[in-house]
Amino acid sequence: MEEMIEPLDRVFLQLGPFTIYWYGVLIGLGVIIGYVMASRESVRRGMPKDTFSDFVMYVIPVAIIFARLYYVIFRWEQYADDPIRVFYIWEGGLAIHGALIGGVLTAYILTKKRQLSFWQLMDVAAPSILIGQAIGRWGNFMNQEVYGGPVTREFLEGLMLPEFIINQMYINGTYYHPTFLYESIWNFIGVVVLLLLRRVNLRRGELFFSYLIWYSIGRFFIEGMRLDNLMIGDSLRTAQIVSILLIVGALLLWWYRRAKGLATERYLDPHQPARTNGNKKKTKKKKKK
């Protein structure tokens, strides 16, 4: 039976010399759905119109570049002999932690320039980021990557998985854990959790911290099952180290901002422009008069 199993076609569409892969289509779909969610929520929160459409133009390209650089840095041995392959992103190899670094840095710079609340923006974006990740993992599925250790077909059938998933997990003569699916499900559940937390009316920044904590917990354990890990040396899994740092960092920032009285505004509070030094000086001058 196994001899007849063929992997799903990675190509979504062929237009003359141009090939569109499922990997890019699914990542793009995740970005679009995430953008629509965030854009609608930003309007409900009273943020300036077209805030997210403006930000997406900068954040997404930078996030993709950082995602690729992050991956290539930890897998340079694959590209050293043929560096042009660094640009072959349709083959896979975009690291979410790299995308987060690039995206968050870009968002921080833009919010400061436009006098918007960075924490409000990240809170609004948090569920959208997670749903984008959940959908994007199916791009890994189409590429037959992000899989775990070997298992039997009976094990996969016991999970009540559809036939097409079971067959796609048959790689080079062996069945593997569909860790892409575990993470995708974890992320979809996380989206629901974050949407429920919106109603709790956390202080600004704390919904984003909740996202970092939720995603990192799942990623830490699922990463331990994977065989294609990015590594530091021979024994340290990069994603597990970064996940621990994100959890600790999010908890510390959560505590620090509350302890220092920096987290005064809440998620459901109406939008207000971010305070700047210039605004503070003007306020002081008015008081003197």
From Swiss-Prot:
It is found in: Cell membrane. Its EC number is 2.5.1.145. A 1,2-diacyl-sn-glycero-3-phospho-(1'-sn-glycerol) binds at R137. PROSITE patterns: LGT. Pathway: Protein modification; lipoprotein biosynthesis (diacylglyceryl transfer). It is an enzyme of class 2 (transferase). One of its GO terms (biological process) is lipoprotein biosynthetic process. One of its GO terms (molecular function) is phosphatidylglycerol-prolipoprotein diacylglyceryl transferase activity. InterPro entries: Lgt. Keywords: Cell membrane, Membrane, Transferase, Transmembrane, Transmembrane helix. Disulfide bonds: none annotated. Pfam families: LGT. It is a multi-pass membrane protein. The chain crosses the membrane at residues 18-38, 54-74, 86-106, 116-136, 177-197, 205-225, 236-256. One of its GO terms (cellular component) is plasma membrane. Coiled coil: none annotated. HAMAP family: Lgt (MF_01147). Belongs to the Lgt family. Catalyzes the transfer of the diacylglyceryl group from phosphatidylglycerol to the sulfhydryl group of the N-terminal cysteine of a prolipoprotein, the first step in the formation of mature lipoproteins. This is Phosphatidylglycerol--prolipoprotein diacylglyceryl transferase. The gene is lgt.
